[in-house]
Amino acid sequence: MPFAAALSTHPVTAHATGEVVGQILDRLGRHPDLAVLFVTRPHLGALEDAAGTVRQLLEPSVLIGCGAESVAGNGHEVEEAPAVTLWAGVFGPVAPIRLWSEGTEDESGRQQIEGWPSSTAFTAQALLLLADPYSFPIDGFLRELGGYQPGLRVLGGMASAGQGPGANRLALDDRVFTGGAIGALIGPGIVLETVVSQGCRPIGRPLVVTKAERNVIYELAGEPALERLLEMARNGMPDRDVQLINQGLHVGLVLDEHKVDFGRGDFLIRNVLGADRTNGAMAVGELVDVGTTVQFHVRDAASADEDLRELLALRHADGALLFTCNGRGTRLFDQPDHDAGVVRDLLGDPPLAGFFAAGELGPVGTRNFLHGFTASVALFRDSK
């Protein structure tokens, strides 16, 4: 198998790094094409040393990594405690990438992003991206990328160890950065599948937006948006769903209007930010056009579990990277190790590493998005 992963909870960074590197060497050997390293906050100050050890002993072609609030490895999750997790794979061409923004804007008011390579030695099928949420304009980057690299899938997450500007750490080969974004372009030598589990279930029925402005929905199917929601609640909605609405309502936006029936993976889930009782308008966390089909959604542990299991069912992976939300884990589920455990149980325990992100990256339909409360999974399968 061309993949290996290891997890250590030793509190001393040098010891923990030695443990995970040793396990990778035993299972995979030296010179992997890609190594991915995640460390929790107690190890954050020593990320440069940890990355240096990985490079010296493992000698990967490309190394990427970051600090995180919590991490995952091989079916287990370590939340807010010392941990180092390392993943490596031998699967073909990989190219490192470093992106940043100086804060300058172009004529259209968009922040200019520097660092995208003018060419690569191969045609990339995906980008694994780790970014600093305080300094990198991720939404703008994803929109731009869709224009000049259509079809390139982006998976990854926003670094979560830092609690303010300049506090995060991103590792790329022999350098560590406090801002911007780093990543790896994945070439054609491997089969790569993406799973984006947004953890919600629909309530009511799909409705067409008939009046909207930017991120405010005024009317659904000719009636005030809030009135449509209240109408559903009054007409036989289960008490549990009413409780979940009060805890946090979401809206799913259909991305492919050519479909007749909508199911999991057809909606981009966004939070409902608030409502105006005077006119029935609702503000949501995404720009919405008139004519868009939407459906209200709710989220709880049961729906998040069901969604992830259904999306992973009947899939296969030789290796996996997990980018889950720092609002999941035991903050959402009653038992520890949920997301990593589901991947292990359904996919036959592939070598897995990951981290709890401050925003997860993954495609829905043909476009890449920044998500929240999501589990975004990269599934690698040997093409031979």
What are these regions (language model features)?
Residues M1-L34, V39-R55, P60-V62, C66-A320, ...:
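Small-residue-enriched flexible segments
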